[in-house]
Structures are given as structure tokens and as C-alpha cells.
Amino acid sequence: MSFSLNFTLPANTTSSPVVTSGKGADCGPSLGLAAGIPSLVATALLVALLLILIHRRRRSSESTEEIERPCEISEIYDNPRVAENPRRSPTHEKNIMGAEEAHIYVKTVSGSQEPMRDTYRPAVEMERRRGLWWLIPRLSLE
């Protein structure tokens, strides 16, 4: 299979570079091969990038499935790693109604006891300001 390019110019125009050597201007196959190399490289890079993204997504989805799986009570007592991490245990889930279940007191440096602030639950004042509750005056029945 041979490949050749045939360039013809209209009669009233002149071509700028005049070929003076004895060899002809038949460089068609090498020109076609050189023009195809960048597109082949770009295609290979896109395929490699796609494979990397698919591999990362599979690996991250497998790790999140393991983390989000509910923890059985028997697993808490049998596995020391789970027992050391109380965030995974079902006893430390958020209370849906927002009421506090227990008060934890922390002894400060000065010796007085203060209730420990729960870092996972926003303060009551912040919950009131989320809506329009801050517009309603606080009425105390005491």
C-alpha cells in the first residue's frame, strides 16, 4: 500500500520554496506517520488517566463501604481496634431529638468543674439563630 500526496497549484501562483535537489518531494508516508504520533500519544495518555481514575474510585468506594458498614455489638467487644474508637460504636450515635443524654464535667486547672462542651453538637444558641428564632423574644416562665 503506497501513500502519496499530490499538491497542485493554480497556474497564476508560484510556490515559494523551489526544490532544487534531485530527490522528489514525495515525503507522504513519513509525513503521515509523524502527524499521527502526537494523536497516538494523547490517546494513550487519556486511556491511562481514565484507568487511574477508575482504580482510585474503586479503591475509595471499597474503603468507604467498610467504614459506613454498621457495627455489630459483638464486633465492639471482640475487636480491640473498634473498642478503642468510640465513634463507630452505636452507643455514641446522635440523638435525633437534640436532647442531651448525659452531662460530662471537666475539672479545670483552677480546680472548678465546668460542663464539657460537645464538639459534635452545636450550641443551643447557634441552633436558635439558624432559623428566625432570634426574632422572638425569650419569655421565661420562672
From Swiss-Prot:
Lineage, top-rank taxon, reads Eukaryota
User: Which regions face the Extracellular side of the membrane?
Assistant: 1-33
Glycosylated residue positions:
6, 12, 14
Which Gene Ontology cellular component annotation is one that this UniProt entry carries?
cytoplasm
Q: Which residues cross the membrane?
A: 34-54
In this UniProt entry, which residues form the Cytoplasmic topological domain(s)?
Answer: 55-142
- Required for plasma membrane localization: region residues: 78-94
- What GO biological process term is on the record, naming one? regulation of oligodendrocyte differentiation
The UniProt keywords, alphabetically, are: Cell membrane, Cytoplasm, Glycoprotein, Membrane, Transmembrane, Transmembrane helix
Please indicate if the UniProt record lists Nucleotidyltransferase as a keyword. no
Regarding tissue, the record states: Specifically expressed in brain.
Question: Which residue stretches, if any, does this entry annotate as coiled coil?
Answer: none
Protein's job: Central nervous system-specific myelin protein that increase myelin genes expression during oligodendrocyte differentiation. Promotes oligodendrocyte terminal differentiation.
What's this protein's name? Opalin
Q: Which gene encodes it?
A: OPALIN
